[in-house]
């Protein structure tokens, strides 16, 4: 039987360093204070950031609202400009002067149509006013009929009153306004805008056709308008 002998030298008990209880308590307190300080600092920082964010959002919202209002106004102005440019391009595509230079009959018909439109516009405006005042319009119609006949417009005489055969609206206005209305319908909902675009169409048409009257005996649209306006004023001024 083998005898086992244990030597005490092989087993050494190492001394374990221990921290006093009071020192551990102090460390815990310091750590808690540090954590609390960090927490308070974080809360304060979060609050400041939140206030800044809200302030920035309010400023941004106000600026955005102001920008949108300005953009809306700019967009309206821009759209009016675009519509007018489209109408001008449409008129250029019609090439009234180019066609008139190639076709004398077309040039003659264009002049007659323009002057007849001037006649109709002045007649309607003055007759409406005279009728509203209970004035007989027959003498006025007779006199402006004679003016139209003297201007070289073809027509017919009925009940001693000459009426141009082409009397009516300017034939070039409708194509311009209609084409713009089809392309930009949202711009023609307002009656004021409709009237504005119609006036613009008449203006650019008169500018376009003016050279057609340079070498003919017929008065220009502006001259014919003044002739009819003077006749109308004579009757209007005599109204009570």
UniProtKB/Swiss-Prot annotation:
GO BP term (any one): actin cytoskeleton organization
Major location category of this protein: secreted
Localisation: Secreted
GO molecular function, one term: guanyl-nucleotide exchange factor activity
GO cellular component terms attached to this protein's record: extracellular region
Transmembrane feature ranges: none
Effect of residue 73 to E: In strain: SARC16 / s3014
Ranges where the record places region GEF catalytic domain: 78-240
InterPro entries to which the protein is assigned, alphabetical: SopE (IPR005414), SopE-like_GEF_dom_sf (IPR035949), SopE_GEF_dom (IPR016019), SopE_N_dom (IPR016018)
Keyword annotations of the record: GTPase activation, Guanine-nucleotide releasing factor, Secreted, Virulence
SUPFAM superfamilies in the cross-refs: SopE-like GEF domain
Family: Belongs to the GEF (guanine exchange factor) SopE family.
Note: Encoded within a prophage region, which is only present in very few Salmonella isolates.
Physiological role: Activator for both CDC42 and RAC1 by directly engaging these Rho GTPases and acting as potent guanine nucleotide exchange factor (GEF). This activation results in actin cytoskeleton rearrangements and stimulates membrane ruffling, promoting bacterial entry into non-phagocytic cells.
Name the UniProt record assigns to this protein: Guanine nucleotide exchange factor SopE
């Amino acid at each position: 039987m083998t005898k086992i002998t244990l030597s005490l030298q092989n087993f050494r008990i190492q001394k374990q360093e221990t921290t006093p209880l009071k020192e551990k308590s102090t460390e815990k307190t310091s750590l808690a204070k540090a954590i609390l300080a960090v927490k308070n600092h974080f809360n304060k920082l979060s609050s400041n950031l939140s206030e800044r964010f809200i302030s920035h959002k309010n400023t941004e919202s106000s600026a955005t609202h102001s920008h949108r209002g300005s953009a809306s106004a700019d967009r309206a102005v821009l759209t009016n400009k675009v519509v007018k440019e489209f109408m001008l391009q449409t008129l250029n595509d019609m090439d009234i002067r180019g066609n008139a230079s190639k076709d004398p009959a077309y040039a003659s018909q264009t002049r007659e149509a323009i002057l007849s439109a001037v006649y109709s516009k002045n007649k309607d405006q003055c007759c409406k006013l005279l009728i509203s005042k209970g004035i007989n319009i027959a003498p006025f119609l007779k006199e402006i009929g004679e003016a139209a006949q003297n201007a070289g417009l073809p027509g017919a005489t009925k009940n001693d009153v000459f009426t141009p055969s082409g009397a009516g609206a300017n034939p070039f206005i409708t194509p311009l306004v209609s084409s713009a209305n089809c392309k930009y319908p949202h711009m023609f909902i307002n009656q004021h805008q409709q009237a504005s675009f119609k006036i613009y169409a008449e203006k650019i048409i008169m500018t376009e056709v003016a050279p057609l009257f340079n070498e003919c005996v017929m008065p220009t649209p502006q001259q014919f308008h003044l002739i009819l306006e003077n006749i109308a004023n004579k009757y209007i001024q005599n109204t009570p």
